[in-house]
Amino acid sequence: MAEGHGTTAHTGAEGGHKAPFPPFQQDTFASQLVSLLIAFVALYLIVSKVALPKVGGVLDARQKKIEDDFAAALRLKGESDDALKAYEDALAQARARAQAIGTETRERLNAAAEAERKTLEQRLAVKLADAEKTIAATREQAMSNVRGIATDAASAIVQQLVGIAPDAKAVGHAVDATLKG
C-alpha cells in the first residue's frame, strides 16, 4: 500500500501551467465546428422532416377546426334566424286569427243583440199599443160614467138648492158643455 501513496497524478502541464479548457483549444476548433455543423444539419433535418410537419399538421387541423366551427356557427345562426322568423310569422298569424275571431264574435253577438232588441221593441210596441187602447177604452168608459155621475150629482145639487127637480136634458147639456170645455 505504500506504493499507492508514493505516486501522484499530474493534471497540469509541464512547468506548472494548467492545460487550456478543451473546447477553447485552437487545434480542435476545426473538428468542433464540423461536429457542430453536422449536429445543426441533423437537428435541422429532424426538425424540418419530423417535428415541423407534425406542428404544421396540428396547426392546420386547428385552423380547419376553427373554420368548421365558424361555418357551423354561421349555419346555426342562419337556422336560428329562420326559426325566429317562422316563430314571429306564426305569432303574427295567430294574433291576426285571434283578432278576426274576436271581431267575428263581437259582430255576431252585436247582430244577435240587435235582433233581440228589435224583437223586444216590437213586443213592447204591441203591448204599448194594447195598453193605450185599454187606457183609452177605460178612460172613455170612465168619462161616460163621469158624465152619468156628474149629471146625477148636478141634478141632486140643483134639487137641493132650488127645491125643484131640473130637466134631465138640460142638466145633460150643461154637463156635456162643462166636460168639453
Curated annotation (Swiss-Prot):
GO terms for cellular component: plasma membrane; proton-transporting ATP synthase complex. It is found in: Cell inner membrane. GO terms for molecular function: proton-transporting ATP synthase activity, rotational mechanism; proton-transporting ATPase activity, rotational mechanism. F(1)F(0) ATP synthase produces ATP from ADP in the presence of a proton or sodium gradient. F-type ATPases consist of two structural domains, F(1) containing the extramembraneous catalytic core and F(0) containing the membrane proton channel, linked together by a central stalk and a peripheral stalk. During catalysis, ATP synthesis in the catalytic domain of F(1) is coupled via a rotary mechanism of the central stalk subunits to proton translocation. Component of the F(0) channel, it forms part of the peripheral stalk, linking F(1) to F(0). The b'-subunit is a diverged and duplicated form of b found in plants and photosynthetic bacteria. Belongs to the ATPase B chain family. F-type ATPases have 2 components, F(1) - the catalytic core - and F(0) - the membrane proton channel. F(1) has five subunits: alpha(3), beta(3), gamma(1), delta(1), epsilon(1). F(0) has three main subunits: a(1), b(2) and c(10-14). The alpha and beta chains form an alternating ring which encloses part of the gamma chain. F(1) is attached to F(0) by a central stalk formed by the gamma and epsilon chains, while a peripheral stalk is formed by the delta and b chains. This is ATP synthase subunit b 2. It comes from Rhodopseudomonas palustris (strain BisA53). The lineage of its organism: Bacteria, Pseudomonadati, Pseudomonadota, Alphaproteobacteria, Hyphomicrobiales. The gene is atpF2.
